[in-house]
């Protein structure tokens, strides 16, 4: 489950990333750690993401975050490149992996099922679409989906 502060964090982070030619690919606030850890994953849109990209984003973002007071207590900020994640999250991921075999799991069962494996056909605002044994199956986003590449 996404921490409630994440949408505000993303709203703050995305313009900073865009100004630097970067894209925010993920944000996680791990409050189970002491101090809590805010992890932001970024990707350079033109080339491989470098340490300089992470450092530039970190400096700009941290200054804005401190000014915003979104996080009231001490925290650790980690900025990194996502590398190749097995999880599909962004629209770019779903376009890049169209036709690839994926595994979809849901938090809540849909039609008595919580896991599907098939060829990714796409995603829209309503569902993720898989081809399973030649048949297109729509799995609604409302059941809480995780989409990943198979191991």
UniProtKB/Swiss-Prot annotation:
Keywords on record: Cytoplasm, Ribosome biogenesis
Keyword field contains Phosphoprotein: no
Pfam families tied to this protein: DUF150_C, RimP_N
One example of a Gene Ontology biological process annotation: translation
Subcellular location: Cytoplasm
GO cellular component: cytosol
Main localization of the protein described in the UniProt heading: cytoplasm
Record-linked InterPro entries: Ribosome_maturation_RimP, RimP_C, RimP_C_sf, RimP_N, RimP_N_sf
Keyword field contains Cytoplasm: yes
Function: Required for maturation of 30S ribosomal subunits.
Protein family: Belongs to the RimP family.
Stated name of the protein: Ribosome maturation factor RimP
Species: Synechocystis sp. (strain ATCC 27184 / PCC 6803 / Kazusa)
Taxonomic placement: Bacteria, Bacillati, Cyanobacteriota, Cyanophyceae, Synechococcales
Gene name of the encoded protein: rimP
């Amino acid at each position: 489950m996404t921490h409630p502060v994440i949408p505000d964090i993303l709203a703050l982070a995305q313009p900073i990333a865009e100004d630097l030619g970067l894209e925010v690919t993920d944000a996680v606030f791990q409050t189970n750690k002491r101090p809590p850890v805010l992890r932001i994953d970024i990707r350079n849109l033109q080339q491989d993401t470098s340490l300089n990209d992470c450092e530039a984003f970190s400096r700009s973002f941290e200054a804005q975050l401190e000014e915003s007071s979104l996080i009231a207590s001490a925290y650790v900020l980690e900025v990194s490149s996502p590398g190749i994640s097995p999880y599909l999250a962004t629209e770019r991921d779903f376009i890049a992996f169209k036709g690839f075999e994926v595994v979809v799991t849901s938090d809540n069962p849909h039609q008595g099922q919580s896991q599907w494996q098939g060829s990714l056909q796409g995603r829209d605002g309503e569902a993720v679409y898989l081809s399973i044994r030649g048949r297109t199956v729509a799995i609604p986003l409302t059941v809480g989906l995780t989409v990943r590449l198979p191991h």
